[in-house]
Amino acid sequence: MFLLYEYDIFWTFLIISSLIPILAFFISGILAPISKGPEKLSSYESGIEPIGDAWLQFRIRYYMFALVFVVFDVETVFLYPWAMSFDILGVSVFIEALIFVLILIVGLVYAWRKGALEWS
């Protein structure tokens, strides 16, 4: 007998959701044709053969913009459910969310002062 019977559904879901991708990769490996022709080994970009040097170096600016975007995107993910249940949660959760936003604003000011948001 399973001791934590209230978690049966959780463990069943975890096992099934772990087995589905493993089985998909296994079946794909068995059914996929194995061919190492010249077209398979050549590089292409969006279905077009590259002309000249295909390697392009991206500047750190793109990385910094992406990083700042991800930080504020995650902020939105956390703040949206809070805003939807604001009237139920009360003032203490409002203070916690305010502290969270203030920490992110400090991070934004730091990135701004370091020049992470400067394009030129």
Curated annotation (Swiss-Prot):
One of its GO terms (molecular function) is quinone binding. The keyword Translocase applies. The lineage of its organism: Eukaryota, Viridiplantae, Streptophyta, Embryophyta, Tracheophyta. It is found in: Plastid, Chloroplast thylakoid membrane. InterPro entries: NAD(P)H_OxRDtase_bac/plastid, NADH_UbQ/plastoQ_OxRdtase_su3, NDAH_ubi_oxred_su3_sf. It catalyses: a plastoquinone + NADH + (n+1) H(+)(in) = a plastoquinol + NAD(+) + n H(+)(out); a plastoquinone + NADPH + (n+1) H(+)(in) = a plastoquinol + NADP(+) + n H(+)(out). NDH shuttles electrons from NAD(P)H:plastoquinone, via FMN and iron-sulfur (Fe-S) centers, to quinones in the photosynthetic chain and possibly in a chloroplast respiratory chain. The immediate electron acceptor for the enzyme in this species is believed to be plastoquinone. Couples the redox reaction to proton translocation, and thus conserves the redox energy in a proton gradient. This is NAD(P)H-quinone oxidoreductase subunit 3, chloroplastic. The chain crosses the membrane at residues 14-34, 64-84, 88-108. Belongs to the complex I subunit 3 family. Its EC number is 7.1.1.-. It comes from the Eukaryota. One of its GO terms (cellular component) is NADH dehydrogenase complex. One of its GO terms (biological process) is photosynthesis, light reaction.
